[in-house]
Amino acid sequence: MSVHIYSPPPTDPNEAERERAVVDTGALQARDDAKLEAICKEACRKVRGTSSLLSVLYGDTQYVIAAYGFQAGAYSRKNSLSGHALAAGNEIFIIPDLSSDERFAENPWINGENARFRFYAASLVRPYGRLPIGVLSVLDEKMRTTFSEPERRIVISAAEDAAARIVQISQERNMSPVPSPPPRS
């Protein structure tokens, strides 16, 4: 067993309210949605990353509800890069070289225990334009010295598209079918 020293992500002071937003949107039930998967794939392809994730953070867990080049599923929030992006609260959160940032250098997703990601860019996912429920991120196994403004816009736009799709899924789930009129006798 190895011991890793890295900084777990801080928790937002409005965490309870943010978690209510996660529940209200039904985002955790949006897993396996082909359109969300396509958003991840397109963002990854456009910025030439190796992986892209749509993560929803709730409790002690990071739920990867859609991904490209990565396994969707539930992961510990204490190792979460997305938790740091969420806590930062910035429209775009970029770490050019994860291995040289003391917050992440010994994280198992960086040091090779789980993966060897070196670059990370993420944007907040805000259904209804409100509290962020998670992030859309693009990762690369190579560090980057630059991340252009058009690339930043791609990640931000993908997060906006993911938020809109989560809203659409939520609305579709909440719609009740119109009952048919009773048969005439």
Regions inferred by a protein language model and the residue ranges of each:
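Intrinsically disordered, low-complexity terminal regulatory regions
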Residues: M1-S80, P150, S157, R165-S185
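Regulatory sensory and allosteric helical modules in signal-transduction proteins
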Residues: S51, L57, T61-I65, A72-R118
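PAS (Per-ARNT-Sim) sensory domains
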Residues: G134-V135, R152
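Short beta-strand-to-loop transition segments that serve as allosteric relay/switch motifs
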Residues: L136-T145
